[in-house]
Amino acid sequence: MAGISAGKTAVKGVKAIVFDMDGVLIDSEPLHLLAYQKYLANFALTFGEDDNHNFLGMKDLDCAKHLIKRYQLEMTALEFVGQKEKVLHELFNEQLKVQPGVFKTLEKAHQLKLPTAIASSATMPTIELVVELTRTSHYFQYLCSGDEVQNGKPAPDVFLLAAERLGVKPSECLVIEDTYNGVCAAKAAGMMCIAIPCQATKHQDFAHADLVLASMEEVKLEELIQPGSLA
């Protein structure tokens, strides 16, 4: 499994896989940008690609708090998230696409009896909508949301929650991420991490990932569960 670059930790002996969602399982970063733009247009406000890049991997609630403070909006963060999420869900229903190699990887994990979870900064309603639209709910033992933890990525909270629910040690978990914040969270949790940058995150620094691949198509699960090193 040839990587673009390799980190210091050997990717080996994987006993569970934890997937980020946005940018990893689905090509959603452009839709998040459009949702912010559509919602903030109601206030005659703009939201650019640089703004979206700064929010990649962060909890929706944290993003909302930042924007409310910046623009002095008279609403709570929960109200902001709820309204922006309505726009996002409409876009997901119309335009959502699964990333290349995802179905093959999930099916292989199922065949190998590797337990899997989603650990996303997104809200639980958004995660549930995605697995419904993509018809992948049967592949995941657990769904873990940024709603359920105190600290969002780059803190490790959501990944540690996933490991606890899966019943495995953090060191036995492989995280697949696409953002700098997500990789930081995975490594802070003591987990192995493969970064697969998406179009929106290809400019980010992934030197701290254990392995960087160009696509989910390059993930070879048979090798990951072996005790030998892939790095």
Which ranges hold each PLM region?
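Asp-based, Mg2+/Mn2+-dependent phosphohydrolase catalytic module
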Residues: 2-16, 107-110, 123-231
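N-terminal helical cap/lid subdomain that shapes the substrate entry/recognition surface
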Residues: 7-112
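Ser/Thr-glycine-rich phosphate-binding loops at phosphate-binding pockets of nucleotides
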Residues: 24, 28, 120, 182
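Residue-level signature of catalytic and energy-coupling elements of molecular machines
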Residues: 36, 64, 120, 155, ...
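Residue-level detector of anion-binding/catalytic polar loops
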Residues: 46, 115, 192
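Short, flexible loop segments at the rims of nucleotide/cofactor-binding pockets, characterized by
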Residues: 92-97, 121, 189-190
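Residue-level marker of regulatory loop/turn positions in helix-turn-helix DNA-binding domains and
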Residues: 98, 119, 151
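Hydrophobic beta-strand core positions in alpha/beta domains
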Residues: 117-118, 195
